[in-house]
């Protein structure tokens, strides 16, 4: 069944359809959310910045003390093999996710988590890119909303570790969508500073300058970095700073960056139009430039 064979592979090179993919109920991914992750997208079915995603994944391994029991070169080889195996199940113009979820493996209640008692659970799968829900926002912009739920402080969990302990992201997104079903969350930290979206980074334009929060309380997104590089190549000044809701509300333009949709314009913030309520010229220029990387 094509719908059931978009692909999943594990470290032992077993490729199985989705319906046959299983992990133990005692896996640390299930019991503790003890999982690091990366999600890469393809363009023309070629993975975009896979090396950078894997480099970040291995930094997360180091900081979480998860031993993947394979080198980064082996991880890349298995990932590319998986894409090759399942590419015929995708249409010629269809792109996909390449997702890595790696847990510490079997968890023993009351055990010492510093002792990895089993092989890690390495889950790699492909999934169709469904951009339909985001497509309208390229022209009309999204409504950015600040939910009550706050970012987990970096003193508790460094935001640069990309992990699957994502309950607070889910709550924040639910709260934003209760305000507006089409809303995208802008999560603040405990001090009221702008942190990030549940799956992306926040940017604003003010007086021709591109401004984004520092990585003190947000993930250092790869699309974030690409956007900043493009802006500099276009002679747009880039500033990393502490920003607050006031700054977004009074900005000239605003957008969110993330792997699947690259750049999503925001034209409304907490019910108020941003500038004239239209997608701004610098945002449009950055979108076009990013497409042609």
Predicted regions span which residues?
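Adenylate-forming
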Residues: 57, 292-293
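Single conserved hydrophobic/aromatic residue that forms the stacking wall/gate
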Residues: 1-12, 291-292
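N-terminal basic/disordered segments at the start of proteins
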Residues: 10, 14-16, 21-22
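A residue-level signal for conserved active-site and pocket-lining positions in enzyme catalytic cores
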Residues: 13, 33, 57, 100, ...
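Extended Lys/Arg-rich, glycine-bearing segments that form polyanion-binding/interaction patches
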Residues: 74-180, 275-278, 282-290
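Short histidine-centered catalytic/ligand-binding loop motif
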Residues: 43, 58-71, 157-163, 211-218
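N-terminal nucleophile
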Residues: 22-37, 103, 124, 177-290
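N-terminal cap/recognition module
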Residues: 19-61
């Amino acid at each position: 069944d094509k719908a059931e064979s978009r692909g999943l592979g594990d470290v032992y090179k077993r490729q199985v359809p989705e319906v046959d993919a299983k992990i133990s109920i005692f896996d640390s991914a299930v019991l503790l959310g003890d999982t690091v992750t990366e999600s890469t997208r393809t363009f023309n079915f070629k993975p975009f910045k896979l090396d950078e995603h894997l480099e970040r994944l291995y930094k997360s391994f180091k900081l979480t003390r998860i031993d993947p029991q394979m080198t980064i070169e082996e991880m890349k080889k298995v990932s590319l093999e998986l894409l090759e195996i399942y590419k015929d199940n995708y249409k010629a113009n269809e792109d996909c996710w390449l997702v890595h979820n790696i847990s510490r493996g079997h968890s023993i209640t009351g055990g010492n988590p510093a002792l990895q008692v089993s092989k890690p659970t390495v889950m790699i799968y492909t999934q169709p890119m469904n951009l339909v829900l985001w497509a309208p926002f390229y022209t009309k912009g999204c409504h950015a909303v600040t939910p009550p739920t706050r970012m987990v402080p970096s003193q508790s969990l460094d935001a640069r570790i990309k992990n699957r302990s994502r309950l607070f992201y889910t709550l924040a997104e639910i709260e934003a969508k209760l305000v507006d079903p089409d809303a995208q969350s802008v999560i603040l930290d405990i001090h009221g500073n702008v942190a990030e979206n549940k799956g992306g980074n926040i940017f604003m334009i003010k007086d021709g300058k591109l401004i984004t929060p520092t990585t003190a309380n947000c993930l250092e997104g790869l699309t974030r970095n690409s956007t900043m590089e493009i802006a500099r190549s276009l002679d747009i000044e880039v500033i990393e700073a502490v920003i607050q809701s006031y700054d977004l509300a009074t900005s000239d333009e605003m957008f969110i960056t993330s792997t699947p949709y690259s750049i999503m314009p925001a034209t409304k913030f907490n019910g108020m139009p941003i500038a004239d309520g239209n997608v701004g010229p610098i945002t449009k220029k950055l979108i076009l430039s990013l497409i042609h990387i």
